[in-house]
Each structure stands twice: as structure tokens, then as C-alpha cells.
Amino acid sequence: MFLNTLKAVFGTKNDREVKKYFKRVAQINALEGNYQNLSDDELKAEFAKFKEQILSGEKNENDVLNDVFAIVRETGKRTLNMRHFDVQLIGGMVLHDGKIAEMKTGEGKTLVATLPVVLNAMSGKGVHVVTVNDYLAKRDAEQMSAIYNFLGFSVGVVLSSQNSDIEHKQAYDCDITYGTNNEFGFDYLRDNMKFSKAEKVQREHNFVIVDEVDSILIDEARTPLIISGPTNRTLDGYIKANEVAKQMQKGEAVLPPAKPEGDFVVDEKNRNILITEAGIAKAEKLFGVENLYSLDNAILAHQLDQALKAHNLFEKDVHYVLRNNEVIIVDEFTGRLSEGRRFSEGLHQALEAKENVKIQEESQTLADITFQNYFRMYNKLAGMTGTAQTEATEFSQIYSLDVISIPTNIPIKRQDKDDLIYKTQNEKFKAVIEEIKKANAKGQPVLVGTASIERSEVFHNMLVKEKIPHHVLNAKNHEQEALIIQDAGKKGAVTIATNMAGRGVDIKIDDEIRALGGLYIIGTERHESRRIDNQLRGRAGRQGDPGISRFYLSLEDNLLRIFGGDRIKSIMDRLGIEEGESIESRIVTRAVENAQKKVESLHFESRKHLLEYDDVANEQRKTIYRYRNELLDENYDIRAKISQNIAEYSANVMNDYILDESGSNVNFENLKAKILYECSTQISEKDFENLSVIEMQDKLSQILENSYNEKMSRLEIKELRNIERILYLQVLDNAWREHLYQMDILKTGIGLRGYNQKDPLVEYKKESYNLFLELVNRIKFDSIKLLFSVQFNQEEVQNLENKANEENEKLLQSSVEMGASEDNLGEAEFKKVPRNAPCPCGSGKKFKECHGKSGPKQGILA
């Protein structure tokens, strides 16, 4: 109450921020008359003057903002016959300040972006504009290019349909580049697998505006971009695990100390499976093993866990569909099919076994990055969306982005009615159809939002029976989708769409539809996120148009059933609600919103938790990529680096074979054998007589230096440096891939440390640091071994770089390019663990000192 009083007197923080921006709008408006009186050439000359001041450092972007915004507004009027509204100027300033502009549907976000894009492109460092699909990227670039071209800027578009690096490089070399988040991210990963700077396509990460920022930075935050290659692991275990999973009985969860019945319990809130003691015994009998959680059977245990998830947490036509005997993921937020993406951790293989289709082989990560860490690389990050305030805390904590709600140009007239709640889904379905029939009878257009493809089909079949013409929108073709959505506001139109389909395309209505009350939005289920519901509502009431929105719910809906159904059911029982009747109450609507807040909080904590782990790997990634870029630089002294590595290698090897501190006792036989094997170099015991430990290390280093120089003496210096650089890069890349595999193993088993009263995150940081030190040493020493052992003829020398690139291309072509991450930090997966890796059992010891030496120990799958 006290806070509400303060807000009424002083306004909210958002109100105060907007008020500050309005003061600057007045200054921009005062310049409008000056620029509208100029000819085209004079206007261009004025802009060129400001651009020169930016490039020379005489002024910065903030100094010229008023004039540049006024010029862009005037350019929009002349080229597109579109004038930026005052509130759009505010949106532009918010984006330029590196914040998120929350602007309602129909407020012209595409036009708003031109203001900060032009202002920040003046430095010549490039501006990226990110959209959610190729159609929107192409459309926005084409629509706004008239403004950019008038002011002398080039515009490029990065599309998934473009197959060559040349096309991508041309797009990135433009002043302004439009594209999707996936393409920007994958190009970054591919660039860091190239063998020369000239082959890279991206420039520096200067300024980026992310359209539909909530979809990309929140909804997609747990989905890493992955470039991967095939492995040689057997897939038979998934078939066995699937057969066992089908024979296990589901039990009901109970509160401790009571023990659940059945073989396993489904934890729907956390989307996890808990196997009971009886279930473990049954699985061991069916598999024919004594201990399911021994080292030898741990992969089988993991495959069983994934099989149980596949059967109990993932529904066909909800979470995935079958197309041409392939399991294709359905994006939970858009309802679109996610071609090319696969669930990780063996879950996709489990789904393929469940559906009895060909099981695709597992893959090994070659390079990966999350959107969270990719977009945080930019010098300045900004975003636009119609719905961001509900996630303002996450934007602030994860991305350091403030959310500013921009006032609408014309007040919203849409009526948002309270939810109607029914006892069963069938009652709800019938009520929705009756409401559609009423609206359709008078010609009012209706947009029906569903939570899944399966639900879309239910309403489609019911409308067919009622002989009501309609469109079903859950296609994967964004362009076709956009055309259908554009017609959703026409008289008599009935459109069924998954909640987010067609996003980025406005639904326009005419005067006849306005007289009928505007577009009618019917939500058939509350999403776990209030933001998705608000996006559905926002399809109606654009630019001050009338409209109606209402959600129809049932106690059998997942959200109410899992997170809040008991309280609402008791209210309905007290009110004596009969079959077919509904309840409409602000109390119930608030209870539903509270359930959504619970889920949002769970998801936020999950994303935050994952980021804490990913930040560890991200720092290592940045270090390796930074060093890799140094190696690509022609001015980098690779020969000095090799000499340094030879010295470290020599010291390391000598220490392994010196048997006492004085250095008087050295195992020369084994030392000579090692140097001959690894460096193709003969050494004599006489060379080391009467030398101290340090002198022996230096002597070995000198011998190896001379041997290396002699070996490479027949090559031209330029050729030699190129060979050294490429071979060093190959060693680095191979070591990095192996390191990513080790990190995957570490992350998979780290949750078990909690059973030993240790913080898994702290343990993960310690172990990953040790792994990184091993990685650095492996790069140093393996490069030395390779350089000493490699033999070339002249043709191979000339084609070395081409061959390296061809091998990379093969890897990229075989890659599984998108990973849909399931959060399985608590599951130990004992694969073919390298001897020096941390043992997955969680002991903290190296594998060779634990299970690799002493044989299997009993473990628990968390």
C-alpha cells in the first residue's frame, strides 16, 4: 500500500526514465524544420559532416544524437513515406543506451531500429541486427535499406540458405548486417576453426540489436549452439534400455520417510525421473547385470534414465513429431519444428528407440557456445520486444540490461477479460468452439492460441465437424506463416496457431472489423511463462485498435495440474461448480498467475545455474580462441614460441628421468629411447656428464633446437613458418576438442560431489582449472612431438593449408549443428575416460588413480 502511494506521487522508475527521454525528444523535434527544408544532396552532406566528426574523434555518438535522429526521421519520410513518432524516438534512444525497449505489437520496432543502427554505424565498426528467422531478417533489411542506402550505408543479410563463406563475408563487411541468432553464433564458431584470418567472415563484435530479445536471450538461453562430429560408440544400449523401460511400472511420489511404490517416480516440476530401489533391482534382473551402477554398467544406467524420460516426460506431437521416420524437436515456445536440432545427453537416441526408428549415432562436441555468452561478447548489446518486464530481473542480473517500457503512440483499447476455468479439458474444448461459433456468426475474426501441435489438431478436427472454415498455423515455413497471419484480421477469419507462431508480423484490421469489436484472441491454455501469454494477447489491439482477449482453462491443464490445481479445485468445489459450468474470478486468475510465477522462478534459477557452469568453460574458450587468433596473425613469432616449448619440454622430460635431486643418477636408457621416439633425435650420455640438473635441461633443449633446425633447413623460411603455424593450430584444435569432451564428462558427474558435502560448482571450477592446465601442456608438448616427427615432400608443403581446411569442412558437414540442452548436471556417465581425466565417480582423483586402477565401485545415479 505504501509503495503504491509513493508510485502515485512520484511515478515509477520507468516513468521517470521515460520523462528524461521526452526532454530530448523535444530537442530533436525542434530540428525537424531545419532538415525538411534541405534538398536530398544537402541533407546527405549534413549527415556526411557528422559522420566525419565521429570518424575523426572530434565528437562521439551522444554529441550528434539529436541531429542524426532528426536526419534519419527526415530520410524515412522521403524514402519510405514513414515518419518516426515521438515514442519511436524514445525507443531509439533506449536502444542506443544499450537497454531493452519494450514496445507493444504494432508500434513499429523495425522502423525504430533504424535510429540507433545509423547512429552506431557511423564509426565504421559495423552494426548487427538479429531476428528470430530468415524471413524477418530478409524482410526487415529490404524494407529499411532505403533509409540506409540514402545515407551512404551498405546493408547485408546473413541467411541459412547461403552456402558459401563468400556470401557471409560480403554480408558482414557491410556497414549494417541483418541475420538470425543461429547464423551469427555458428559463424563465430566456424571462424574459430579457420586456418587463416582471410578466411574468417565476421568482423569485431561492436553493437548488436536483438529483435524479439526475450525469445532469444531467455527462451533459447538453455539451448547451446553446437558444432559436432560423429563418434564410434555403440547404440545397442539404447534398444536394450528402451525394452527395459517399457516393463517398468510408474509409482506415485510420496513425502519422506515413506517410500514410493513402483519402479520409478516422475518429477514433473523438475522434469526428472527417480528410480526406486525396487526399480533398480528389476532393471538389474532385466539387463542381466549384478550392479547397474558399477563402472562397467554406468553408461547403461544413463541410457535407462533417458529411456524412462523419453517414455514419461516427452510426448509425441507435443515435444517432438515424427517426419519421414525421424524424430524432430518441436520448439516449446514457438510450436515450430526445429529441423537440424537434436536433444543432447543421449535423449534423442532414447526417443528414436521409443518410436522404433533408425537410431542416429551420438556426436562429439567440436565447438559450442550459448547465446548468453555469445551476445555478451559485443561492446554494446540492446534489444526490442513487446514483452520484457516480467523478465526484467533476469535481463538485469544475467546481461546487465535495463528494461524500459515505451508508451504506446495511441492508448490501448483492447479488453483483457478474466480467465474462464472449467473442470475438464473436454468441457473447455466445447466452450471454446461455442465462443468461436458466436464470433464467426457475426464475422468477427478469431485467433485461437494453442500450446502444442497436438492441441491445434484437436481444435482443427472439432471445427471441421462444425463446418467452420479456418487456417491451422504450425508450419515450419516462416514466409507462408507470415502470409496466413496477415490475413487473420479479415472478416470471418478463424486461425488456429501455436502461441508464438507468426511472431514479428502484424495483424491489421479495417474499419468494418473495428466496428465488430476488433480481433478476438482466445487462449486455450496458460503457458508456463506470463510473457508468452502477454504476447498472444498483444496480437490484438495494435495502434489503438479495439480487440478482445480471453483465456479458457481447465483443471486438467498441465500448469494447473502440476503447480496450482488443488487450491483452484477447492474454490470450484466450494462454489458448487457443476459439469459444463465455468468460474470467472479475479482470485482464480491471480492464483493462476502465482502458479506461473513459481514456474518462471524455477526456470530463472535453472538458467542462472547453467550459466554459472558455462561461464567457467566460456573463460577457457575465450582464452583458447584469443591465442588461436594470435597464431593466425602473420606477425606472430611462432618460432620463438616453438623454442619456448622445446625448453619446457626438455625440462619436463629431464625431470621425469632424473632419479635424485643432485642429478647424478639419470635413467639415460629410457631417456634416450623417449627422445628418439618422440623427437627422432639421438642423444649421447657423454653430452650430459658433470652437469647440474638445470644445465642438463638446457643441454637437452640445445640439442633439440639444433636437431629441429637441421630437419627444417631445406625449407624456405616463409614455408617453414606456415607449416609451423598450421601444425600448431591442428594440435590446438584437436586438444581443445578432447578438452571439451573431458569437460562434458566432468559436468555430467559433478553433481555427485553433493553427496560428499561438497559444493559441485566449486568442485567443477577446481577440476576444470586442472583440466585446462593439462590442455595447455598438451598443446605445448604435442606440437613439439608433431613438428619433430612429421615428414614432407614439396607437394604436401604447398597443399598443407588446403588439406587442413578440407578436414575441417568434413567435420563441419557431418556436424549436428544445434543442441537442445537438457539440464543433466547430476548424472554420472562413465564413458571411455582418458587416464588423466577426473574420475566421474566424484572422488576428486584422476581416473588412473581411482576406477581406472582399482576396478568398479558401487555408485549412485543422482
Curated annotation (Swiss-Prot):
This is Protein translocase subunit SecA. ATP binds at Q88, G106, E107, G108, K109, T110, D506. Belongs to the SecA family. One of its GO terms (biological process) is intracellular protein transmembrane transport. May bind 1 zinc ion per subunit. NCBIfam families: PRK09200.1 (NF006630), PRK12904.1 (NF009538), secA (TIGR00963). It catalyses: ATP + H2O + cellular proteinSide 1 = ADP + phosphate + cellular proteinSide 2. HAMAP family: SecA (MF_01382). GO terms for molecular function: ATP binding; metal ion binding; protein-exporting ATPase activity. Monomer and homodimer. Part of the essential Sec protein translocation apparatus which comprises SecA, SecYEG and auxiliary proteins SecDF-YajC and YidC. Pfam families: P-loop_SecA (PF21090), SEC-C (PF02810), SecA_DEAD (PF07517), SecA_PP_bind (PF01043), SecA_SW (PF07516). GO terms for cellular component: cell envelope Sec protein transport complex; cytosol; plasma membrane. Zn(2+) binds at C839, C841, C850, H851. It comes from the Bacteria. PROSITE patterns: SECA_MOTOR_DEAD. It is a peripheral membrane protein. It is an enzyme of class 7 (translocase). Its main location: membrane. Its EC number is 7.4.2.8. Its cofactor is Zn(2+). It is found in: Cell inner membrane; Cytoplasm. SMART domains: SecA_DEAD (SM00957), SecA_PP_bind (SM00958). Keywords: ATP-binding, Cell inner membrane, Cell membrane, Cytoplasm, Membrane, Metal-binding, Nucleotide-binding, Protein transport, Translocase, Translocation, Transport, Zinc.
